[in-house]
Amino acid sequence: MWTSSQTSKSKSNTESTSTGKTSRVVSVFHIGRDLCGHPGFVHGGLLSVLFDEVFARCVSAAFPSGLGMTANLNVDFRKPALPDRMYVLQVETTKVEGRKAWVQGRMTYLPVHLPVPSDGIEAIVPDSALLREDAEGSVMVAEAKALFIEPKFADVSIIFP
């Protein structure tokens, strides 16, 4: 999995954060055949886990402690996820209020089948093809929204002897 994140100062009047930061994360990854729930289809639970993990990385910039826990995660599956594809997961923090942060994202894949040659060297896909907002021919697999909460104990340091 390749992940890139961007943090910026809050520019919107509707966003209020204690850190003044919003963030975006783009993750690119390959899902192979061993992660299928039914033959030929990637297990939906895996997609939910990927959303949760990347969402957590995204909202961590919004909290002083860098720790956020999932309070609610809603995933809307749009099309079946197919194996042996390159997936792009784009997420952003949409709102932060105190210890709460809302995040949303979308997962797409490029329809090109990317076989791994017998020499083991993976096919190379240009970054520009993966990172465009609406890459030509990309297929929307799922959209998700989540609420993360910074735990009250996050700022407490416990030192064990």
Where are these regions (language model features)?
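Short histidine-centered catalytic/ligand-binding loop motif
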Residues: 31-45
